[in-house]
């Protein structure tokens, strides 16, 4: 349920709903931003992504869950560019404590 709420919020560029899912000490890692620590800093980075694109669609191909972790195989479309990747999310007490994103980024 939490994972699905995150996916919907991300697709809707709903930074307030995303914020409600993140722990204060949330850590975001991905190939672009590298490593960001803290909810506020991560939300700022996510906001920049949202503002930089007109059209964004995040589609989960498969979701794997256990007690405290989720793995999402996904396709992310940003302004007509399609990226495939995997998000590994760690949860604690109903909040996301870490998200590690692995993307197949096209070479220029």
Language-model-detected regions and their locations in the chain:
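Short, well-ordered alpha-helical segments enriched in acidic and aromatic residues
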Residues: 2, 12-25
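Amphipathic alpha-helical repeat scaffolds
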Residues: 4-8
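A beta-strand edge to alpha-helix "cap/lid" segment located at domain peripheries
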Residues: 11, 29, 43-108
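A short gly/proline-enriched turn/hairpin at secondary-structure junctions
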Residues: 27-37
């Amino acid at each position: 349920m939490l994972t699905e709420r995150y996916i919907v919020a991300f697709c809707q560029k709903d930074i307030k709903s995303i914020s409600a899912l993140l722990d204060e000490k949330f850590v975001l890692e991905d190939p672009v931003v590298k490593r960001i620590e803290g909810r506020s800093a991560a939300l700022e980075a996510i906001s920049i992504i949202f503002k930089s694109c007109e059209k964004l669609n995040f589609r989960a191909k498969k979701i794997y869950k256990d007690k405290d972790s989720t793995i999402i195989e996904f396709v992310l479309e940003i302004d007509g560019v399609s990226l495939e990747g995997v998000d590994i999310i760690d949860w604690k007490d109903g909040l996301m404590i870490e998200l590690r994103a692995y993307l197949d980024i096209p070479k220029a």
